[in-house]
Amino acid sequence: MIRRTIPQKTISNEVELNGVGLHSGQKVNIKFKPAPVDTGLVFIREDLSEDNMINANIKYISNTDRGTNIDNGIVRIQTSEHVLAALVGLGIDNCFISLNGPEVPIMDGSSKDFIQVLEKAEIKEQGILREEFFPDSPITFKDEESGGEISLVPYENYSIDTTVDYGTKVLGTQKAYIDDISEFKEEISIARTFSFLHELEMLLDNGLIKGGDLNNAIVYVDKPLDDSNMEKLKKAFN
């Protein structure tokens, strides 16, 4: 079922941030620009001369291992999850997101900096109502390999409830929920990227987290390290 009850929103002014890509380690500039109604959230790769745009659409998701990557066969965007969470969390429907590289900057590992700069851009309502999907019956998807499961059920209000368990005593079972998207800024946006210590060697060996450090991620120590591995990590993270 599609409902139209809330006006679409965009930003009033262009704003920007500078940072580094978590996995590429490359310096990157990101700009947020106002967009007309029914545009959606659109990434623009300034470093590509033509055919440089891609919509933030589920059909373009190419990989979700250590980040949400989208790819339309021409344009690729890596680690899009934090910036998209900020835009959705603030109720922004239409925005051009311009990058001078393939990866969104990691900032401090959360959505906080994106929230702050988007609020400075002054969010405004537009003249057309937003289309919102409401399920008529429960929808469930389960990934048999990972065990992850997501369910969407009919409900008159907004509610998200999540549980994660990585099978480690260091972290344990984690639960979180919000009953209104307006809670995103205070309750969710400051949540930061994390990793377990045992994963770092594998990530480095696969050419990832080149821009990672303790300023943009939390590392849970879940195993002892010998001297050689400790030196390897020290060298990687300066």
Model-derived features: positions:
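Short acidic-hydrophobic catalytic motif
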Residues: 1-238
